[in-house]
Amino acid sequence: MKKQIYTLFFLIFFFSCNDTAETFLSLKKNKVNVRYGPSFDSDVKYVYKKINLPIKQIDKKENFRRIIDMKNNSGWIHLSQLKNNNSVISTDLKILYKKPSSFAKPIAQLKKGRLLIVKECKKKWCSVETGKFTGWVDKENLWGISK
């Protein structure tokens, strides 16, 4: 009996831990409709007009994903308009460095709200591209990536 109780607690703990992982996605197109509900019959709530914009998935129903953006706008988007996340948004003034170190040569200053395309990430740093600049930025104050 004790063994069954311990097994039950373990399974509950294991599955509850897996549900806490954040899922970020990016917009696949330049124009994406966000709907009130998970159906093409639902009215359009608003339209995103920014390809690669990162969004956070908070629910799913069939081929629709309920999302929330950096400004807490939420709604439903069809899966065909989404892709695996490849971008982040700077939530504060940031410095883009040549190498993944705050002692490296600064390349550019990134303003709050800047969309960055992620090339790769290491522990505390991500290699990003924005406009004509490519470099490294620390993960702190970036929205759209699991820490």
Task: Describe each region flagged by the PLM.
Residues T20-N33, P38-K50, P54-E62, I68-A108, ...:
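Boundary regions of SH3-family modules and the immediately adjacent low-complexity/disordered segments
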Residues Q4-F14:
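Sec-dependent N-terminal signal peptides
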